[in-house]
Amino acid sequence: LDYYWDDVPSDKQKEIFQQQVDLAKKHQKPIIIHTIEQFLISTNIDEIVVAVPQNWISYTEDIINRYCKDKKIHVIQGGATRNETIMNVCNYIQNISPNEENIVVTHDAVRPFITQRIIKENIEMCKEYGAADTVIPATDTIVHAKYGQFISDIPVRSEMYQGQTPQTFKVNEFINVYNSLSEGEKTILTDATKVYVMREKKVALVEGESYNIKITTKYDLKMANL
């Protein structure tokens, strides 16, 4: 699980973190706890690694110990980006449990409505194809505007999907593929699965759920009714 999103500015991430604090003060479970609980009950998950910014580690450990303390939960420092964070997690996993067959199921800490089906199917697809991404079909027409002013293209909607998480990878393969990228290639990454796409590797699709939302605003929190 991670608190890093390449598409969420740092000031918004601070606001999201403050939501966790405010919920705890109201004696309500922080969003991340709801998320962790879904992975704790999964029979397919051996260890849970929560990656957060350095200055969030102490608080994250405190709320985990308060609500769902478990020896399989580990809190570590993430990286400067989503993909660097995944690399930190992958390296941590290989240090505590070296295994060529290790799989990492990466998930946004603020997507608490993850289902057991989605977790299970991510792992199954990853075992078969090497990587998996959770998506839902696009319901609106997608417009491509290369320079943000005029329409460049309108893709066929039936071929378009909206990305969610989890995104799931074989640990060693992710490390190898990511390390094969140049620094220039790494700077343009906006999504973990693009690491694979850039190296023309298959990423299998897993059907998500419309309610598997990322809670990043007060409106999202109200709609989630947590």
Residue ranges and their predicted role:
Residues 212-226:
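Hydrophobic helical membrane-anchoring modules
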Residues 1-33:
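Divalent metal-binding pocket/active-site signature
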Residues 32-101, 181-184:
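Conserved N-terminal catalytic core of the sugar/cofactor nucleotidyltransferase
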Residues 24, 32, 89, 108, ...:
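Residue-level signal for inorganic ion chemistry
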Residues 49-50, 106, 131-134:
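Structural beta-sheet core signal
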Residues 98-110:
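Short beta-strand-to-loop acidic/aromatic patch adjacent to the donor-nucleotide binding site
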Residues 100, 113-206:
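Conserved core of the sugar-phosphate nucleotidyltransferase
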Residues 60-64, 122, 224:
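Hydrophobic packing residues within well-ordered alpha-helices of enzyme cores
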